[in-house]
Each structure stands twice: as C-alpha cells, then as structure tokens.
Amino acid sequence: MPAEWCGHSATWLSWPHNLETWPTKLASVREVWIQMITLLAPHERIYVLVNEERSADEVRARLETARAATENVTLLKIPTIDVWMRDYGPTFVTRSAPENPLAFNDWIFNGWGGKYPSYELDERVARDLASLLHVPVFRHDIVLEGGSIEVNGAGTCLTTEQCLLNQNRNPQLTRAEIDGFLKDSLGVSDVIWLGEGIVGDDTDGHIDDIARFVNPTTVTCIVEANSRDENYRFLEENYERLQIAVDQNGAKLSVVKLPCPDPMYDGGVRLPASYANFYIANEVVLVPIFDDAHDVEALGLLQELFPNRKVHGLRCNDVVAGLGAIHCVTQQQPQAAR
C-alpha cells in the first residue's frame, strides 16, 4: 500500500446528504466539500458520489460559482448512506503486475462495530467501484475500516488496539492473526500497535485521529497539554509507544508532537476534533481547524513537515459534529505505473 504522500491519480468523496448526521448543519458542511474539491481539483481528478441527479446539478453549480477546476471533477450516481469514504470505500494498493498495477482491498464494513446497522449498506460502495474501475479486487473476510490503518509506504503500518482488537469487529481473530493479516494485505513487514483513541471517536480509536506518517521515517502524534483532560493519559501512552517503536528496518522513528484543540462539544457530547485528521494530496495538505487557539500552531507545524506542499486549513467545526473530519471523508487512488 503506497503512503498517502505518494502521487495520486484521484481522490474519492461522497456528497453529504444525511440529515441524521447533520440535522442543522448540512448546508455549511456542504460548503466545506466545495472548498475541498476546489483546493484538490487543480492537482488531481476528483470523483464525487451522489445519490441523485439533483445533487449532481447542485454540485456542478456550486463548483462553477467557486471557479473550481470542474474539468477535473467527475460526478457519479452511486447511492450512499453517508460520507465516510475512508472507512467503507476501497483501500487501494499497487502491484508489480504490469497488466493490472492498481488493485484494491475490499474489507467488511459493519457500521463501526454494529453501532449504526443501516450504515452497513455502504459496504456495497466498494463493489460498485470495482465494476466501474475494472481493477482486481481482494475481498477479505475481516471487518476493517480504512481510518484504522496508516502506512509509511516502506513496510510499516500503524493501528490501534482499541479498534482492531475490539470484540465488535473480529472476535474470532487473535492479535497475532490480525497482525499477520495486515502484513499480507497491505504489503508491510511491521505493525506498530498504539492503544486508545481520542474521546468522542465513535469508531473505537481510529489511528487517523491520533498518529500519522508524514514521511517514511517521521510520524506526527497528537498530545494533550492539559493533564486533567480525559484524553491526556491515553495520548501520553501512545506517544511513549511511538518513542520506542522501530520501523521495518529496525530504526527508531522521529516523533513530532501535534497539539490538540480545546475540547469541543455538541449537545453535551464531546467531539473527536483532531488536527491529525489531515489529508495529503498532490501539492496540498488539507487540515481541519476549529476556531481554536491551537489552529495556527498546528498549521505551522504541518507546513514545516510538508515543505513541498501548501497546507490549507479548513474550518471543520460543523463537519466534526458528524464525528469525523477531512481524512475520514477522503480516499486516495494512487498512481500506478504500467
């Protein structure tokens, strides 16, 4: 599996429409999608899944108003329940086979451990894309979401115990079996296991809210400065694990701390706001920001870590009320050399 910073041929998104996810915020959430597409489209093709032609017309009109590079945007009528393409969409891999260098893994999606049974319908999206793309598909008898794995493209994968060892995913599998499965399906030789995710994350601790590779030897990890915050202990333990972890070559990683925004709530429920939920695309990095005092620091740190890309902050206060942000709703399709 290539690292996210490797060249993309496309980014995949689903157009927001679920009022249960955003009962009062759907209009502002859609504006963030327009911003994402506008920033990404000059650098790679953007595929947007829509439920109906009326939605496609709306997206086209809004992109034209935003003066987006619409020639690089393709709208596809493929129904979805919600927008979390990272988790239910295909996980692309590249291969040495010259006739079919691009393929993807199709995992079982069970609505994040059965929390949202109706969301299991989104498992069909990967199958729909398989018939559209005409690439080899590796279908696996394991529950897994794309947001639970992070790779450096050189042989190392990050994940969390809270998610992949959760009894609501694959209770029949041992840790060693899951470890071996990740190695086989992602083409990695080493798996680094972190512990717990952040409070408010209904995915049971996805790695893409916690720690992210920014190059083959460097990982950025969120830390909580307030020792009284409920995230403090979990994040300190994750940071300590990364400090002693080694990559596929047995070398220690460079670990860069990334701050946490102050706690955010919606209806009394804590939200999983995290600067680690950024998306690395061709030429740009899209970062969720939250009208928070730590926004500028986080953007500055990430710009230093990505000197050859332009880092853009997108206000995600309303998006994260749906319990996810930018990385959760994007899926990269890597370039595959023939």
Give each language-model segment a name.
Residues 1-338:
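The feature marks the mature, well-folded catalytic cores of soluble enzymes
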